[in-house]
Amino acid sequence: MQIGVVMGGVSTEKEISNLTGKYIIENLDKSKYEILPIPINTKFELIDKIKCLEFAFIALHGNFGEDGKVQALLETMGVPYSGSGVLASSLCMDKNMSKKILQGEGIKTPRWIMLYKNEDIDFESIKNIGYPLVVKPNSGGSSIGITIVKKEQELIKAIEEAFKFDEEILIEEYIKGEEITCCMLDGKPLPILSIKTKEEFFNYKAKYFEGVAEEKVADLSLELKDQVEKISNKCWKSFKLKVYGRIDMIIKGNEVYVIEINTLPGMTKYSLFPKSAKAYGLNFSELLDKIIELSIKEYEF
């Protein structure tokens, strides 16, 4: 089978996408697949590069990759692809919409308000959230543009930083607790990972540089483990996720807060998903086989 690994892209996460793509190419079984690297530098070249593919393994992150646009293009052209569909990708990329759905499903998520570029800032609502708080772009990932603001004097600088990456940003309640992630494969939870970082939070540096964060199987009580898995399953169904995904959470006391849902989790050497799969008993090559197998079943045109 011919597998095109679509990588690069046009978002701020291009560098990470290239790392993901490279690691996927290195670990795909060469005896099973004819592997074609598909580097993307502009939106327009994608159509020519993917039209003859038997299968597209999407290694893109951020806008025009993780937001449903590439998925829609592939579906239109009849090319099967890895991961979730158009709707799930679009919803999970929009943190504001995601949080509204989480709220509607009775799943805890930090309180938040939205700010829009070139509109007045609602300082009173921000004050009601309280400090410390988190300022982040509404779309995008890899923790790019995120700042933890401890006091009011730091707020404007953090807002300006987030607006460099998006026209819409979130001001979010800061939840101090244990950072965990639940990777899902075919709708089933893999071992839950606990994240301990030397940084202030699980930021870009902690995610992609060796030795900055320690991720290991979480030592949770049976009750908490069950709660996390139930929440993850509910997220999977509510957002119509397919094949694989990752739900990032924080545990505070006995309460679990969903921070965000990733439809195309990072697949670099240091990424969480391969580590969780390894703890389950799947090496990276086997994980890639499983993603391809499940995706083809899911997207039969």
UniProtKB/Swiss-Prot annotation:
Cell compartments where the protein resides: Cytoplasm
Amino-acid positions noted as binding ATP in the UniProt annotation, renumbered to this chain: 126-181
Keywords in alphabetical order: ATP-binding, Cell shape, Cell wall biogenesis/degradation, Cytoplasm, Ligase, Magnesium, Manganese, Metal-binding, Nucleotide-binding, Peptidoglycan synthesis
UniProt cross-references to PROSITE patterns, sorted A to Z: ATP_GRASP (PS50975), DALA_DALA_LIGASE_1 (PS00843), DALA_DALA_LIGASE_2 (PS00844)
Requisite cofactors: Mg(2+); Mn(2+)
SMART domains: GARS_A
GO BP term, example: regulation of cell shape
Known EC number: 6.3.2.4
Keyword Ligase: yes
Biological pathway: Cell wall biogenesis; peptidoglycan biosynthesis
Tagged with keyword Magnesium: yes
GO terms for cellular component: cytoplasm
NCBIfam families reported for this sequence: D_ala_D_alaTIGR, PRK01372.1
Job of this protein: Cell wall formation.
Name used for this protein in its record: D-alanine--D-alanine ligase A
Lineage, uppermost ranks: Bacteria, Bacillati, Bacillota, Clostridia, Eubacteriales
